[in-house]
From Swiss-Prot:
One of its GO terms (molecular function) is ATP binding. Its EC number is 7.3.2.2. Pfam families: ABC_tran. It catalyses: phosphonate(out) + ATP + H2O = phosphonate(in) + ADP + phosphate + H(+). Disulfide bonds: none annotated. It is an enzyme of class 7 (translocase). PROSITE patterns: ABC_TRANSPORTER_1, ABC_TRANSPORTER_2, PHNC. The gene is phnC1. It is found in: Cell inner membrane. The lineage of its organism: Bacteria, Pseudomonadati, Pseudomonadota, Alphaproteobacteria, Hyphomicrobiales. GO terms for cellular component: plasma membrane. The complex is composed of two ATP-binding proteins (PhnC), two transmembrane proteins (PhnE) and a solute-binding protein (PhnD). This is Phosphonates import ATP-binding protein PhnC 1. Keywords: ATP-binding, Cell inner membrane, Cell membrane, Membrane, Nucleotide-binding, Phosphonate transport, Translocase, Transport. It comes from Rhodopseudomonas palustris (strain ATCC BAA-98 / CGA009).
Amino acid sequence: MLVVEGLTCRFGSKAAVDGASFSVERGSFVGVIGRSGAGKSTLLRMLNRLAEPSEGRILFEGIDVTALQGRELRQWRARSAMIFQQFNLIGRLDVLTNVLMGRLSEVPSWRSLVQMWPEQDRALAISALDQFDMASYAAQRADQLSGGQQQRVAIARALVQQPDIVLADEPIASLDPRNTKIVMDALLRINKHFGITVLCNLHSLDLARSYCDRLIGMASGRVVFDGAPAALTDQIARELYDLEADEVLGTASHVPHGLPAPALAGVAVA
């Protein structure tokens, strides 16, 4: 279980995240929602320790993540794989090598420098690409792919880290509707098929309701909603987005055909 206790991140006098507290059961698909500047990205970066908390604690299976340093911190970053809005691929390298970068914490640095990856890691990378119909692009340069294809490569890279948690920071923000669905289906697959916990920052409530079994809503750095998608009221929607409710709440879409419907969690409004 992931437990967040009073997590705060300040930049000068401004709190980007202010006293966030929640817990996440293993195997959950949690959407973190709210308008731009609500603190969603900072929250996920703190969970991975790319951003340092000013106050509070992050616990995972009893381990104090906020106290980790050195090799233990690098291991945690491998266990909590990040997926970024801008993909963070190396364009001049081929797709397979980009995916193998997810194994850096497990191999000596000289192997990656001379591109001598162990055969078992290469097989793992090809298998991960195959999960998202990208194995045929293994030898192609990453910068020759579409945005949706690049994001699927980034998800495959996260998968080869063999993580406990995937932290997806606005993974579909720059994608068209078709590629948005492909990428969200890929995230749902690693959650349902591999049992990996997913925390995904999303701006769209319709997508969040379709794919997530739980929502954490943020406004001005604070958690103001934590519960099932069906429990998101007009009042909470207005607080999250500072808009009229009918501008942000639509009819919930269905989970993609062939994938199990998520179970609803309980509701707690902070």
